[in-house]
Amino acid sequence: MLTKNELADIGVLDFQIFLNSLSVTDILIGNGFSINLCERLMYDSLCDLFNKSASNEIKSIFKGFETTNFEKVLEALSNTEKVGSILRRDMKVIRSLKSELKSGLISTIHATHPKAAEIKDTMLRSLAQDFEPFTDIYTTNYDVFLYKIILASNMLSEMNLESFELFNDGFYEEIGNGKLGFVDFNLYPRNLVYLHGALFLFAPMGNTFKLKKLDDGIEFIKLIKQYLDDDEFPVYVAEGKSEEKREAVNNNYYLRTAHNKLKDRDSEVLVVYGFSFSKSDDHITSVINNSKTKQLIISIRQRDSVKEVEKELSRLRVKFPKIEVLFFNSDTLFTFDYPKNYYG
């Protein structure tokens, strides 16, 4: 691995240097952040993992629809079941495939996501401290980590242990049965914005809501299963090509609003951590290129050679031809190895 000095020689600096010299306000968080907290989240595609144990029938349906989107397949199976019922056909096979799809997705989520007991409060409070310089957090992650971190940040403020501005995520309308409806991002000074949705967001009638019971430490996987049993699917965009993701975003009011918030940011500086800007996320790249952003400060993880790092720096610069792209050592922003500031 390269030393800090070797990285600095090719323009990959400690994050503190940028924090001291630039007006840092917002941050975009990708899957690299969650992987640092739980290596099981290394799978970008739940569908790829699901297919390792799926039946040939289910695999052929995904292939036939040319999709990796669970929701599209579930919708197709549900519609087929309805038509069959109207025509009084035996739908036993379809019901079996629906059951396999739902239970397989739940098993896949369970295999990749941490249990509540694995998410240590000390680590959440420590990371809340690391997020202190940032006003808005934008993320393409669909797990529960960042939501838990903003709750920890708010708790520290409310207990007068820190003077952080409060966070919200736009969901603050009580709509009953443990649900909070999305309103806007204007009520609180700091926001967590789910650019690709999250596994605890649902929009059965087009109006997106969040499962409030997450606040009570209930295993959110159990809650997801309850909604899947009613053929309601989480609002999350994690599968497919960039064009498919863009279409999914445009079809949901909350996701459109989230992307517009990223595009319409007032700040000219955006920090990026753990986000690769791969081809499947070109829609995010496009939003940033069409925003007021003038400087991107992107995390770079350790590699074995200067040549490897320089190749990555060049790839990222090409994606943003009109934006100054700067780089920082990913080891110098967040503390994952040991939590600091235990707060007694």
Where is each model-derived feature located?
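SIR2/sirtuin-family catalytic core signature
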Residues: 1-27, 33-37, 245, 253-344
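Gly/serine-rich nucleotide phosphate-binding loop at the start of the catalytic core
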Residues: 1-148, 157
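A Trp-anchored, charged/polar loop motif used as the substrate-binding/catalytic surface
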Residues: 8-13, 116-123, 171-180, 246-262
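Extended, H/D-rich, highly charged conserved domains that either
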Residues: 25, 65-72, 77-88, 128-242, ...
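Single-residue recognition of alpha-helix boundary sites
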Residues: 41, 152-154, 285
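Residues at the C-termini of beta-strands that transition into short coil/loop
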Residues: 50, 141, 196-199, 300, ...
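Short, flexible loop segments at boundaries between secondary-structure elements
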Residues: 55-60, 170-187, 294-312
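Surface-exposed cleft-lining segments at the edges of enzyme active sites
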Residues: 108-115, 167, 242-249
